[in-house]
Amino acid sequence: ALRAEWCRGTLPPGQLGWRKAKDILEQAAALAREALPLRTEAARAVDVDVELGAGRRLTGTVSPIFGNRLVWTTYSKLDGKHLLPAWIPLLALNAFAPEGDWSAVCIGRPKRGAQPRTRRLGRPDTAAVDLLRDLVAIYDLGRREPLPLPLKTSYAYAEARIGGKDP
């Protein structure tokens, strides 16, 4: 993989490019090491079909699921836009099969440092189907006009509130 990246020609020339490629490889390996213990069970898929009301349904397949856990890994620095691809399927699982002990783990690079950042998502405090309805309403609104609060700003505000800081 390292040689392929080098041959692709996207890295700086000489030793600088080689060092950069090795740094990228080390960071990717750290992410893989963090995710591997969470993926020990065989991956499976769950077909969901959730009635949202007003003639709308959410249907699809959530995968891969390891035990009762979604594991989402990204090379990007973990942020709000990386949590949504795990959170929305987690809501779908909780709405479709509320008796399940569903969870999700999101792994990505940290904002600072080298240790991978991990966020665990569990059962929502609010009924999952209600949250899915809210997301559909936001989707509908976004198809008509700009959304009132951008994702990065919303995530920063929520993190500050949860962390007890002044947003």
Residue ranges of predicted features:
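Structural signature of nuclease core domains in nucleic-acid processing machines
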Residues: 1-167
